[in-house]
A protein has these predicted regions:
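ATP/NTP phosphate-donor binding region
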Residues: 1-61
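Cofactor- and metal-binding active-site motifs of prokaryotic enzymes
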Residues: 45-54, 107, 115, 132
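A short, small-residue-rich loop immediately preceding and capping a beta-strand
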Residues: 62-68, 90-93
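N-terminal glycine-rich "phosphate-gripper" loop used for MgATP/nucleotide binding
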Residues: 66-75, 80, 96
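Short acidic, glycine/serine/threonine-rich loops at helix termini
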Residues: 77-78, 105-108, 126-129
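Short, acidic/small-residue loops that bind anionic groups at enzyme active sites
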Residues: 81-106, 113-120
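Conserved anion/nucleotide-ligand pocket segment
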Residues: 111-167
């Protein structure tokens, strides 16, 4: 889903690499109805974002919800979200950046533990993608969090918005 910026802001090659990376974990990747939508603000409307969030939690075939990209305005969704839908249909919710407000709100309103993970696009950005994918797998698929130790990444980027093919 794209609860902040539109997934259409992500370079197509990065999208393809991210999808391939997540599929290497035997995940079936699908995109929400409005993930690539662009309103006058350049992203899905708040109604579209919330519709996608609700649809993802209501769909029994969806096992986890991963934000496409961070951005702005996720806080504007809080008053529109039906927390009972999320509470009644618990599943993995993951992302970071502007998505952090949703991580915290979901925990506060429903008790569902969420995950501060790379957003979808991050898994398509080499050389960071390998490190991110390794710990995404460990965190979500390898048992209890205390069963693995996080090592420092050898790659660090000190600039914002490194989500395109040139990065």
């Amino acid at each position: 889903i794209a609860p902040a910026r539109s997934a259409s802001d992500i370079d197509e090659a990065v999208l393809a690499r991210a999808q391939t990376a997540l599929e290497s974990l035997s995940l079936k990747v699908s995109f929400s109805q409005y993930a690539f939508s662009r309103s006058q603000r350049g992203c899905p409307t708040d109604v579209e974002k919330v519709d996608d969030l609700h649809a993802a939690f209501l769909d029994p075939n969806v096992k986890g919800v991963l934000a496409a990209i961070g951005g702005v305005n996720s806080n504007q969704l809080l008053g529109r979200i039906d927390w009972d839908i999320i509470r009644a249909n618990p599943k993995i919710f993951a992302g970071f950046s502007d998505i952090t407000v949703l991580n915290h709100a979901i925990l506060a309103k429903t008790g569902l533990v969420t995950f501060a993970t790379p957003n979808f696009y991050c898994f398509g950005l080499p050389p960071k993608a390998d490190y991110s994918l390794e710990y995404f797998r460990c965190c979500l698929f390898a048992g209890q969090p205390e069963t693995y130790r996080v090592r420092a990444s050898k790659v660090f980027y000190d600039y914002a918005w490194d989500y395109d093919e040139k990065s």
